[in-house]
Amino acid sequence: MKVINISFLCGLLFQSMLFGQKLTDVDGKSYSIATIKGYQWMTTNLAVKRFKNGEKIMQAQSQEEWKYAAANRIAAWCYYADETGVDMTTILYNWYAVSDKRGLAPSGTHIPSFGEWSALAKNLGGIEVAGGILKSKTGWETSQHLIADPANTFNAKPVGSRYIYLDASANWLDGKSKGKYTNFWTRSSINNDTNSEHAHRMGLAYDVDYLIDDLDGSAESILNAKGNGFSVRCVVDVLP
């Protein structure tokens, strides 16, 4: 009797999805993917509003709700907002959504660790230049710190962030970071301590080339508080 290798067949099925250069989340939203130094990365930010099991993620619609989610370690997302209004194309997550066991990343992908982000930066030529390479060609306040990437595959846009402690976020409509900054969560807590209130993030800024990466593995800062609202990119799982 012929034995069918289920793992092999599943691998082929997954690879066929991969070759189509698209991934789909539980809400039906599709994401393009691109190979960057041997790894498959999403080329746009995650924008899902439900976990993989179908349960809704809490949407915070005020600073009070955002702070409540952080204080109680509740997974939450919000739209970016500033004095010009609400940007409903930009979804920001707190770290508790990133780490929730119900699963934020689309099937077949995962949220990268601090180590995976560091490896990406190294493969792009180092922390000093990786930030400029990862930026989108448009949207930033200045093009002085963009480094030529003909493929422009990562395409990180300056969509802004939401900080739980900074004065700039004390007013829900006072973001002041769109066009200047963007941050991406890693799945790694500071010191690998899940009880810590801080986690590693990777940041890009309009006025520097380097990738802001919290190189000090024990750094705890208001800038990497788990209650902050940052963007998320996912990496395609490597098949065995």
Predicted features and spans:
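Conserved positions within compact, well-structured domain cores
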Residues: 21-240
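Bacterial Sec-dependent N-terminal signal peptides
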Residues: 1-21
